[in-house]
Amino acid sequence: MDTSTSFPSLFLPTLCTILISYIIIKYVLIWNRSSMAAFNLPPSPPKLPIIGNIHHVFSKNVNQTLWKLSKKYGPVMLIDTGAKSFLVVSSSQMAMEVLKTHQEILSTRPSNEGTKRLSYNFSDITFSPHGDHWRDMRKVFVNEFLGPKRAGWFNQVLRMEIKDVINNLSSNPLNTSINLNEMLLSLVYRVVCKFAFGKSYREEPFNGVTLKEMLDESMVVLAGSSADMFPTFGWILDKLYGWNDRLEKCFGNLDGFFEMIINEHLQSASETSEDEKDFVHSLVELSLKDPQFTKDYIKALLLNVLLGAIDTTFTTIVWAMSEIVKNTQVMQKLQTEIRSCIGRKEEVDATDLTNMAYLKMVIKETLRLHPPAPLLFPRECPSHCKIGGYDVFPGTCVVMNGWGIARDPNVWKEIPNEFYPERFENFNIDFLGNHCEMIPFGAGRRSCPGMKSATSTIEFTLVNLLYWFDWEVPSGMNNQDLDMEEDGFLVIQKKSPLFLIPIKHI
């Protein structure tokens, strides 16, 4: 073929398409400016053609970048990323409008291919639209996973696994540091999996992939694809970089893993007593009674358990231990309280924690400075509304920067960027969704249903670690030298692992 004649014939239609698209976009933008003039739009950083504000937020720590931008553009700020508009809320007052005043219309999640696929077509409680299905599924989740009849079994599992950790630490060679990240992640995996599934699957690879690898990969694909931001041509980038194949592989691994768990429970159902039945047994029984409660519904709820309960809990415990050890006066004060409340016992009991006021301050301060999910999962605006006096249009995603809100110097007047638990002595703010000054678990209808069980796990773990052991940094380090750099996107973890030396106290 003569390429000198074929190339123009291929290039000319492409050039015409680009020119026509440019003309259309130009006139649409002009029309938009004139039609939007009557509305009070939120302030926004300068945008570039096509990509919008992506260049402003393309950073390692998006939560910190958005917080810095909010200081210039205000607590209600519009960020455009291609075809998607995000309203970023960075103050407790504006968060109150979103979570309480407008919760009726701002209770639906935005959708993308990743969330749709992994949630079994929005069958779960995290990503499903607000409505009857979401209410029914949340009710099942709360009753069967978090209800009073499950509390005793949860406490028993937690106590057994903590005891195992304490025994392992006690046999640790003298003056030898341990990786608390690995230890605590393993602990939380075992607690969650044994409570929900009846046994820990962490060390049992499925199709050559570990559960941790599956969950890490799911967090990547849930973050979205190029097509989510650029519907017109983003699919080309997804194709080039294999995003769709990656999504299908991730889904296939998770689906196969859940199928295995369900089948194991179906086979053992007749041999399992009522006292021994776990979360999956309850869901399987429900599906046998109600054909509309499908196997996909079970799998969607299992994904919610794994994604919602493991990384966030483990991350918070690591941050808490990091801050406690870094601030030696906090560690001394907290250990004094813990050891005086418990006395000399062979085993710590959950009732021992009742009067530990300083412990609760330390956990509050940890969740304030280090919310596990710094950017709360977005809500989509289905109809026009006003937030902070600004017009917000349908399709806009509303994102609350919980990380920034909890560091607002207008609210947190005493050293807002420092770890100072004593601030809560005369500042009656909780993190359970009643106050918007700190919202690590969200607030309103879409708040995290497992916040109380997560808090119980964090409290009981910290108390045991600090009751049985004193903690030192490795030789050659000072406590104040602990690296507190953040890393991650959906869940913010401590970038460098926490290595500490446990010294048996009792």
UniProtKB/Swiss-Prot annotation:
Primary localisation category: membrane
Compartments reported by the entry: Membrane
Cellular component, GO, one term: membrane
Gene3D superfamilies from the UniProt entry: Cytochrome P450 (1.10.630.10)
Spans through the membrane: 10-30, 301-321
Pathway this chain belongs to: Secondary metabolite biosynthesis; terpenoid biosynthesis
Sugar attachment sites: 32, 63, 121, 168, 175
Reactions catalysed, as given in the entry: (+)-costunolide + reduced [NADPH--hemoprotein reductase] + O2 = parthenolide + oxidized [NADPH--hemoprotein reductase] + H2O + H(+)
Enzyme class, spelled out: oxidoreductase
EC number: 1.14.14.-
SUPFAM superfamilies: Cytochrome P450 (SSF48264)
Membrane topology value: Multi-pass membrane protein
Any one GO MF annotation of this record: heme binding
The entry's keywords: Glycoprotein, Heme, Iron, Membrane, Metal-binding, Monooxygenase, Oxidoreductase, Transmembrane, Transmembrane helix
Binding site for heme: 448
Pfam families (UniProt xref): p450 (PF00067)
Gene Ontology biological-process entries: sesquiterpene biosynthetic process; terpenoid biosynthetic process
InterPro entries: Cyt_P450, Cyt_P450_CS, Cyt_P450_E_grp-I, Cyt_P450_sf
Family indicated by similarity: Belongs to the cytochrome P450 family.
Function field: Involved in the biosynthesis of germacrene-derived sesquiterpene lactones. Component of the parthenolide biosynthetic pathway; parthenolide and conjugates are promising anti-cancer drugs highly active against colon cancer cells. Catalyzes the conversion of costunolide to parthenolide.
Name of the molecule in the record: Parthenolide synthase
Lineage of the organism: Eukaryota, Viridiplantae, Streptophyta, Embryophyta, Tracheophyta
